[in-house]
Amino acid sequence: MSFLTLKDVDLKDKKVLVRVDFNVPVKDGKVTSKVRIEAAIPTIQYILDQGGAVILMSHLGRPTEGEYDSQFSLEPVAKALSEIINKPVKFAKDWLDGVDVKAGEIVMCENVRFNSGEKKSTDDLSKKIASLGDVFVMDAFATAHRAQASTYGVAKYIPVACAGILLTNEIQALEKALKSPKKPMAAIVGGSKVSTKLSVLNNLLDKVEILIVGGGIANTFIKAEGFDVGNSLYEQDLVAEATEILAKAKALGVNIPVPVDVRVAKEFSENAQAIIKKVSDVAADEMILDIGPESEKRIAELLKSANTILWNGPVGVFEFDNFAEGTKALSLSIAQSHAFSVAGGGDTIAAIEKFGIKDQVSYISTAGGAFLEFLEGKKLPAIEILKEKAIR
């Protein structure tokens, strides 16, 4: 690794500032999904075991920066963490002027976005945060693509900055899949829009043997192949771009199995009847909401040959049971595969949970935007600053 990891750093009697991703759903003052909190436990526990004091920072939701708003308070998260780790967790509402914490203790700071200057990573705020600790640990991959005070600025000004256990595992899994994949490699890119994933598709073309498109993205590719998509979600202005990607894939020998059959409906509704049709038969008043059984079989066959699988996005509107078959079949193909598999993004995680394949995916990334930017080949500011600090 080109940056320091938690295990490279002396933590005894040190105040350790940890940027975690505790942006979790809270309803009626209770945390409703603890996945992200649980993911941070190994880092927190390691610091405590090494004799350090833990100061946790995170954002929650999108409050107006610089203003306190009780609905975005991290106090319920501190309580949830205390229950999970079975230790007291102090809560610091006003923390920028100093945090009272001793070795073996945990403090959860209030939402970083209540501080003016967080998003722009102002020097004043960054220096103030850095002065609270001796060591900074970045463990929130989900925010690594943002150069903010609690992810980037603090690392710049604190004496020692390193990656936490979760972040280290995340980068290792993604690098294994993207930089040194065992071939053949397959990538699944689904979701509603080509525009948000265009650079991902282009970047992956040079790395994969199989590129599977799904959701609204697939509709744009179906249109690029000359078929009408009726009332389906697609992007007319990107049809030419999709045509170029298909041509480039052909030249590179990359297989893009554009759906040959689909499940359509007359309306976008949970109760709509799913009708299976060839792509050439989609009527003007119909919308494509899932891939069809023939397309499922083609994908399953292709994935059997893969040694590395990267998955971002569903292939249909899996939230509606009538249009979940394609994503379910894809999930089961990945679950049954011997390949090293990495999955990421909110919808992908929801699909993994819905179809119960969590234990069959090699690595599940909790990140959304950062996961996509990594797939695009972009540099992530919060990772880059850790690399710079390691050289100094």
From Swiss-Prot:
The keyword Transferase appears for this protein: yes
InterPro entries, A to Z: Phosphoglycerate_kinase (IPR001576), Phosphoglycerate_kinase_CS (IPR015911), Phosphoglycerate_kinase_N (IPR015824), Phosphoglycerate_kinase_sf (IPR036043)
Gene Ontology biological-process entries: gluconeogenesis; glycolytic process
Catalytic activity: (2R)-3-phosphoglycerate + ATP = (2R)-3-phospho-glyceroyl phosphate + ADP
Transmembrane stretches, start-end: none
Keywords: ATP-binding, Cytoplasm, Glycolysis, Kinase, Nucleotide-binding, Transferase
Subunit-level organization: Monomer.
PANTHER family: PHOSPHOGLYCERATE KINASE, PHOSPHOGLYCERATE KINASE 1, CHLOROPLASTIC-RELATED
Name of the protein in its database record: Phosphoglycerate kinase
Organism name: Francisella tularensis subsp. novicida (strain U112)
Annotated gene: pgk
